[in-house]
Design a protein with these regions (language model features):
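Bacterial N-terminal signal peptides
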Residues: 2-10
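Extracellular/lumenal mature domains of secreted and surface-exposed proteins
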Residues: 17-24, 30-46, 57-59, 67-72, ...
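Acidic, aromatic-enriched beta-alpha/helix-loop junctions
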Residues: 66-103
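Aromatic sugar-binding surface patches on proteins
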Residues: 94-107, 246-252
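Sec/Tat signal peptide C-region and signal peptidase I cleavage site
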Residues: 11-15
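Helix-rich interaction surfaces within compact, conserved domain-sized segments
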Residues: 103-126
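Short, well-ordered beta-strand segments enriched in hydrophobic/aromatic residues
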Residues: 51-57
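Short, acidic Gly/Pro/Ser/Thr-rich loop/turn segments
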Residues: 62
Length: 297
């Protein structure tokens, strides 16, 4: 009798749920036609009283790469923050549920005179609609850009050897690059591990660790073909590329070939997850930079 009542209650409870919630989260992931969810990763206070909010996403499809243009199906409110978000949502599989997440894909800064403002990102796709509010109200979501336990810091990125530097998820933007359909264009940057590990010689084998670089389309009509878009830290180490001092910079590049004209933004993500006090998920340990590209016919 108890089992029957529990089963009946479960069926009734399920029947009361909206259709899109009956499948989630216990249903298997689909190859295609599944949801893309916006995710609020956390916030960082700034010295001037402003707040930087970090967002990522999860594409639950096992195979389908989803593109959602900016507009009624992919927007941020208040409108002044709209446009920073990605339109291209690759499939990630880094193990476990959290492994499908792409964390810290972009960030927005809420000025001090807008303190308390919620920044809401909405995505509509495949019959699903999800909105996530970014709030700087809970210390649970507050993040630090300070050193990790053994001195690791977010890597540095520059587009010119002596140019502006990114050490954050909000990142910097390169000068716009122009190319044409089918004509490969070189995208390049300088990267550096900023770790301060001299005080931890017994725990940290190296003062500076090889970095991982990943070039990915952030916005655009169709993803370009990249020549070696992802270079892992272990690949870089095997090639003999190491950093011996705090002044050393590594030049990295890829070649991108676009098949359709339009306006694009390419994101470069640089991470130092090889360090012993760093791992994927740690917001400390990667930085973003963005390259706007115009592709003509």
């Amino acid at each position: 009798m108890v089992i029957f009542l529990m089963a009946s209650f479960s069926v009734l409870s399920l029947a009361q749920l909206p259709n899109h919630l009956r499948e989630y989260p216990l249903a298997d992931r689909k190859a295609s036609g599944d949801l893309v969810a916006p995710i609020f990763n956390g916030w960082t206070p700034n010295a001037d009283g402003s707040v930087t909010m970090l967002f990522g996403f999860a594409n639950r499809n096992r195979k389908e790469i989803v593109d959602i243009p900016l507009g009624p199906n992919n927007f941020i409110e208040p409108a002044q923050f709209d446009g920073a978000q990605p339109t291209h949502f690759p499939v990630y599989n880094r193990g476990g549920f959290i492994g499908i997440n792409e964390r810290g894909a972009f960030a927005v800064t809420v000025p001090a005179d807008m303190a308390g403002t919620e920044v809401v990102w909405t995505i509509k796709n495949a019959g699903y609609e999800y909105s996530v509010p970014g709030r700087a109200t809970s210390t649970t979501y507050e993040m630090s850009d300070g050193e990790r336990a053994l001195g690791t810091l977010a890597p540095a990125i520059r587009f010119e050897r002596d140019g502006p530097e990114s050490t954050s998820r909000e990142g910097i933007r390169a000068d716009r690059v122009t190319t044409s359909v089918g004509n490969p264009v070189t995208l390049s940057a300088y990267i550096q591990d900023r770790g301060n590990r001299a005080d931890y010689p017994e725990q940290s084998k190296l003062l500076f660790y090889p970095l991982t670089t990943d070039w990915v389309m952030h916005q655009g009509p169709v993803a370009p073909d990249f020549e070696r878009s992802l270079v892992l830290d272990i690949d870089r180490e095997a090639e003999g590329v190491t950093q011996l001092g705090a002044e050393d910079w590594i030049h990295v590049e890829t070649r991108a070939t676009f098949s359709e004209p339009g306006s694009y933004i390419i994101r470069l993500r640089v991470s130092n997850f090889a360090a012993p006090d760093s791992r994927f998920d740690n917001m400390c340990c990667w930085s973003n930079a963005y390259v706007p590209v115009t592709v003509t016919q």
